[in-house]
Amino acid sequence: MESRFVHACALNLLLIGTFLFPSRPLSGQDETPPQTFDWFLENGVPSQTTWGQLVDTAYTREILSWTTMPEYTNAVVDHLPAHPTVVSPRDHFGYAIGKPGVLHHVDEIYGYFRALSGSTDRVRFQLLGETEEGRNLALVQVGSEANLARLEEVRAGLNSLADPRATSEAEAARIIRDIPPIYALYGGLHSTETGSPEMLMEMAYRLAVSDAPMIREIRENAVVFMVPVAEPDGRDRTVDWHARYNADTYDMDDQVRGPPYWGKYIFHDNNRDGLQLSARLTQELVKLFLEWKFPVGHDLHESVPYLYVSTGTGPYNPTVDPITISEWQWMSNFEVTSLTAHGMPGVWTHGFYSGWYPGYLLWVTNTRNAVGRFYETFGNSFPNTVERTLEGRSTSVEWYRPSPPRDTTLWSLRNNTNYMQPGALTSVFLVAQNRSMILENFWKKSKNSLNKGKTEAPFAYVIPADQERKYNVAAMVNLLQRQGIEMHRAADDGVFDSVEVSEGDFILRMDQPYRNYALTLMRRQDFPADAPTPYDDVAWTYPLHFNVEAFAVEDSIIQSELEVQPITSMVSIPGEVEGGSGDVYLVKPNAAANLLTARLALGDVPVSAVEGEVEVDEDITLDPGAWVLQTEDSREVENWAREHGFTVFRVRNRVLDGAVTHELDLPKIALLHTWTRTQDEGWARFTLDQQGVEYDYIGEDRIGHMGFLKDRYDVLLFPHQGARNTARRIFQGLDPDDGPLAYTRTPEYPTHGFPDSSSNMVGGMGYEGLVAIRDFVNEGGTFIAVGSASTLPLEFGMLRDVSIQAAESTFIPGSILKGEVARRDHPLAYGYGESLPLYHQYGPYLSVSEEEDDGIAIAYTSEGELVLSGLARGGESLKGEPAVYSEQVGQGFIVIYGFDALHRHQNLGNHALIWNAILNWNDLGAGEGGNK
């Protein structure tokens, strides 16, 4: 194996005499730092490879002249083979990949792949689905002519290996013997990590034309899939941004930060969407995997120097098959060893990322019995060559980084390609050489997961269909299906392990290939208290996030004795109208995630809320918050109840005798955003749009210059501003010294100015903005501040009796905690039971004086276990403290949340805490304990 790899080396331009000396710029070059280099000239550019293939000398000269030091390339990528008919990037663009100052838009990248695929039968190109803004993702397939011609056979074989129930041992052995594995590479997911879409164009050409033994091995024994730009909207936005602001930037300190938006909604969290599948790009990439079932997926990112190959520090997610964990180590060690042997410093593994959270793009494969991997390659984001100075922590010698990066170096876009491409080729080469083992492991892991579902508890989850929050139940069941997990409905009643099953209940049987993934989604997470700081959330338990019931069954007999029917389409659970006569309809409060949609669907029907309990009959008493519908159109109400999953009681007027009600009049809403962080407000916009809510979207730079806000709006929603953010940072915004900084659409930069625009994003909201918010509330508006956004009204004194606790010893890194309803008649608590799960990450931790505790709607549980899933180190200090609070200020209200109730569109069970604030915006003082 080693000799075949060594023979793949092409030109070996890393000569001893130049290996450690600084690079020299080409003579006459004025830029500082230099953009081109001549270290290679004394050795010349060979015209052919050691295996006799002609070299594209013009392309190769550009590769080398844009590489800052000889140690930053190797014999795999220090040249490019020539071909008389296959279109190279230089043939298409007029220059090689990695040219200083050049990044390509999506259409240009796709244009090249179309040209490449049109010139060789070893490359195919096709468009995938569209993003929210109408740009397509794309798929590039590279392999031998024979392998590409039988892709349908390969797809069928991989799908058979993924389901051992339908494939015998003998059939699996035949498939493993006959088909190549598919290795999938994703580029450009994080838009300001700009190198991978460039690199993949050259890599595809090299795979198509090179006769190097290494490349021939890959072509014959593997098929490479590439998604060159996983986030097309953000790619174009970023390319425009760097052309607009960084074209003449040659110092990292002078770099203008990237665009405020990537996709329409989602920023960096597009790599945290694997659990909820909200973004179109995530949906497309999951769909791609479920269609092809490729055994290896590899996500290309950029950050730390020079090339980090993922394994992670642990603790690893306990549902990952040990084979997969071993494959992580095996592959990464091979890549680190190979590139280090080529003399390339700074290639390492282990000490970055944990391996616990399953919502990353690479975990689309890890959670489904395949291998998920990622790179972090050193990158500048903008395409100019600049000097980079590294911290000591990045340059220390460690067991996992025996050859560290330099303290200071010149770094170029071409260097980025020179590291990323040979790493990826080395990994695909390893898979091709070990084709049978990769496929056999894929089969074994699928079989292991299936067998665990048959032999280890839980053997099933029962999700009752008849729950209060029918919409939430259906949403969870549908999301499980979209994840590729098989769902059933009970065809009969029964009792299994003390769990009652009714006909029509949803059954998640664990005897299926994705049992391990189903388990990690459904069960409690217990993150070790002594583990290093996790890379992301440590809890995501579906039933808790959706605030629905699901019961684990510990007895395997349910798999053999309960008759079930497979679910083959998305489900809905209809509501119903009970009672035969009456003039009034009472809607049972349920705090469902579609509460706002349901209210909007009623249109002009008068709707009010009962502020106390209401007795329907001697057996049924509704909690505070029941809706009263005044209409004579019974069919309209029945259709509405069925569609939205609500239980409605038809009663006579006398049922409401003595009841206190208030109107649920729909407010005019504005969503306030900052220019420093659009990530969390993007999730809020997504959620509002899913609810069909109309709202105005206003930036911090405008809010103080719009006149009286109350003349325009009733509700001002200010979403979470990121973990541990402060009022000072929120208020100050972007540094004025960096301005003026426009984000506006122009003919030169057509992707800018959306979803919002600004002629100057710096300077924050200013005192004018604070005064505008204060006046808005005093004049009768409701200001809703979520998560860290609540620090703004708190630290600037808009609320006198509420403060933020210092919580140095409290560590809650994205967990699900137990909340309790402090006042059942508080409008913010309408529809919730005595307790509810609350997503929480790093505060803020609220404290309310005893004189104002009537404003507490939800508190963290005061007794028993606080943590429902995850970890809360030092969480005892949070017990009994407020989580959701409202207070009347002037004629209006301020509502604050000590957590993000709209987190990544995951915690749907918390959404009604926001919807209740919107629907009851001018009656938040209602109830016996209120200040109405």
Question: Whereabouts are the PLM-identified features?
Answer:
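Intrinsic-disorder/low-complexity accessory segments
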Residues: Q29-V223, I266, R272, S278-R280, ...
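N-terminal secretory signal peptides that target proteins for export/translocation
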Residues: M1-H7
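Bacterial N-terminal signal peptides
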Residues: C9-P22
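Short, solvent-exposed turn/loop segments enriched in Gly/Ser/Thr/Pro and often Arg
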Residues: V227-E231, H242, L300-L307, A789
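Carboxylate/His-rich catalytic cores and anion/metal-binding grooves
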Residues: A204-A208, N221-R244
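Signal peptide processing junction and immediate N-terminal pro/mature segment
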Residues: L20-E31
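Aromatic (phenylalanine/tyrosine) cluster motif
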Residues: F5, F19-F21, F37
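Active-site-proximal cap/loop segments of hydrolase catalytic domains
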Residues: R235-G263, F267-N270, R280-Q283, K287, ...
